[in-house]
From Swiss-Prot:
SMART domains: RRM
Highest taxon of the lineage: Eukaryota
UniProt lineage: Eukaryota, Fungi, Dikarya, Ascomycota, Taphrinomycotina
Annotated positions of the Phosphoserine modification: 330, 334
Entry's Gene Ontology cellular component terms: chromatin; Mei2 nuclear dot complex; MTREC complex; nuclear body; nucleus
Bias kind Low complexity: ranges: 330-340
Record's compositionally biased regions (Polar residues): 566-579
Region annotated Disordered, chain positions: 322-348, 443-465, 566-589
Pfam assignment, any one: PWI
Protein name as it appears in the record: Uncharacterized RNA-binding protein C902.04
Species name: Schizosaccharomyces pombe (strain 972 / ATCC 24843) (Fission yeast)
Record-linked SUPFAM superfamilies: RNA-binding domain, RBD
GO biological process: nuclear polyadenylation-dependent CUT catabolic process
Amino acid sequence: MPLFLEEHAEYLKRYLEQALEPISDADASVLSDYAMALLRHDSSEEEVRQLCYSQLEDFLRQETIPFVDKIFDVLREKSYLEGASNMPSTGMVTEEVSRYSPTSSMIPATNSMETNFNNSLPAVGKTNTFPSQVPNMFGPPLYHPAATAPSEFMPSIPGFGNLPNPAMPPIPFLPFNPAAQPPFPPPFKMRGKRGFGMRHEHNSELRRHSPGNRRFNPYKAYPQPHLGHRFSRNAGNDPTSTALEVRNIPEEHFNEENIRSFFSKFGVLEKVELNPTHHSCVLEFTSHEAANNAWSSPEPIFNNRFIKIFWYNPSKGFHNRPKKFASHKSPTTSDSSNVESSEDVDPASLLQNEEFHKLIEERQRQHEERLKRINANKKALEELNQKKRELAQQQLKEQELLMQKIKETDRSGNKRLMLLETQHSLLKAEADCLGLPVSNVSESPAASNGSHHPYASGLPQRGTNTFFRGRGRGRGDMFASMSIDNRPTKLRVINVSPEKNEALLQYLFTVGGYEEITEPSTTERLISFQNRNSAEKFFGGVRNVEKLQELELAWVPKTAVTTNTTSMETGESNTSDNMNIEVEEGRWR
């Protein structure tokens, strides 16, 4: 089974070019075609993977294994098709290329342009004599026609067709690229004989020509760039430049003898500098003519299509050169000491370096000090939390004793008892935030006095605050308001038939937040919720369900606390009936 479909080959090639560009000095387009040819092998996936490892190692070196593994992952997930919607279709590309056929067909074969160039201004009614093949001013970039022509110096590789020669990369865009300079004058430049808005610019550079040149070619009015097959860094125009930079030299040819034997045919080599790390070198010839012959030669270097050659510009520096090169001069001036200077530092020598050991000891000491500070902070935080818990527990006990004492000695101190009750509730909430168990704390004596004041206010007790200390347990920050909600959280559902029971359970599962469902009878259900919010959500939404509109809902109060109290000295008689919350059907309390 093929690793990819042929209709997806264009997208895969685009992905491979983008992946190869930063990790290889070879031409990304040609190398991607080579990689796709390897992936097309009719073998198992593991065999193709091993083939890619062996064939791409010469070009990618240490990046070979990560690159191949990544490509197979991409092929398995087909992630290279993610950008397919943004790419033009093949038909559109073919159509655009056919529009921009060779430049020679764009130049008129007759003297149809003589009238326009012999007159200072075009006559009224004259049409544009430029051929229809000239691209639109805002059209796509135009490649030089020779960019896709097969090389006449090397035969095409079997199985690859007429692929571009890597030693002869695509020729740059023509100077009249519509994206850079419009071949036609833009409209509305100046007023002509026919008035404003006419598509003529009478001071165009294309009209500045010699009247005697009847065969004036407007496309040659601009200087042509260097269209050679080698890479240039603008140093080839310098007649004093005699240095070349060669990259991506294979290991078997990376020595002074082979390099000199190949490049000596172009002229006398004065100096060869090798860069073992990047397999590149700098060549210095005795004359600019010899260097130019080597640079412009169409012959592949060492018969390898992926070796690149540049003009070396000393002013910009050689970004791949290390600080110390293996400098190999001519045999008359060679020095073996320069060879030793290019050797990399042995990692084993670092173990014998005292400064290296001192640096390791310093880093280790800093790390140990950092761990000590972290442990000390943790211990201090635990001690602080323990003190907070002990203080809160002590305050609770003192508050209970004080409330009990006031209750026994002063029967008429209702206001003071209400204040202590509120403070006691705040202390219980604070203890709950600190993680202290408050279940064993006796109920507040507020229920025994026959009155219910959940929101009683007053001055805070000494040593307490209106906010809660500590981080809490995810209930907001330390300044968040707290309240005790004693409203009912249990609902009684009446008129539940077997048909409505399933719909009721489905809606209950949708709302969630319930704790228990009991069935006192076949037509009645008691539902306990975790909080008042969930209960109200169920209460308000059950009427909107079509099958549950006939149900009757009622709030079930919490267990009433009945406490018999004696009459106060004020003559007030408070009974436990004041604590009961009456339940009315369908009414929120």
